[in-house]
């Protein structure tokens, strides 16, 4: 990530959501990074696990955890903590996609997470995240001066399509200032 090219001023904190501020992407002619690039640039754990961003939009985020022996559990499949991180990262990607335009006035924070492990996971696993409320509902609450909360639902699947885990993460948009 490059720093701002504008006139010197007080140092800016780095990381999410500051990555989204104007001036953090170099000259105006350069394009903003996509949602997956933002996630990987601001969440070091996602890079540590070598998570792959398959799709990341305001409607859906799909991330993949490759089969890596360094992150296996005692039965040779992905560790529960790695699968949790995969799901949480997918939820973060959809939050960036849906609410990235609100980051100048609110900070997204995960406030609660629940996971259920349904079947044995082996090999590559994929997390698919979807919003549990519409963006319009959440932004309307923010506009009204509230601190909205909204669920993100995540399904974790094996390559054969079997659901190995389900998560719900409650996020909030904490108003700044």
Which stretches of residues belong to each language-model region?
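Compositionally biased, low-complexity flexible segments
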Residues: 1-12
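Short structured motifs
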Residues: 47-53, 111-117, 137-139
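Catalytic strand-loop segment that frames the active site of acyl-thioester-processing enzymes
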Residues: 48-78
